[in-house]
């Protein structure tokens, strides 16, 4: 699974936990105002977009949701907490 993470200055153990769940490719963009939303692209082959809501600009969140929808890539909006994120990931797996 290839995951694009947007937001959070540092992922900490979240990156390790995602790799343990089978993520072979992890791309991280910090998500604050330093991202140009016109140039924001989802890498080819991305299976999931994860947006850390505590650390992301609202305009970036809207832009990434729209882009992901056009590419039929699922998006998860989550706090930067592994407990909260794992619950969201479980909900997505049950829907699949």
PLM feature segments, named:
Residues 1-23, 37-38:
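Redox- and metal-dependent alpha/beta enzyme cores, enriched for Fe-S-associated oxidoreductases
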Residues 18-19, 64, 68:
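A generic structural signal for well-ordered alpha-helical segments
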Residues 24-41:
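A short, well-structured beta->alpha microelement
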Residues 38-43, 89-93:
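Short amphipathic alpha-helix with an adjacent loop that forms part of the alpha/beta core around
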Residues 43-50:
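Short acidic/histidine-rich motifs immediately flanking catalytic phosphotransfer sites
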Residues 53-54:
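Glycine-rich, N-terminal phosphate-binding loop of Rossmann-like dinucleotide-binding domains
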Residues 57-60:
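Short glycine-rich, flexible loops that bind phosphorylated cofactors or substrates
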Residues 68-96:
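Ser/Thr/Gly-rich flexible loops in soluble cytosolic domains mediating phosphotransfer, phosphorylation
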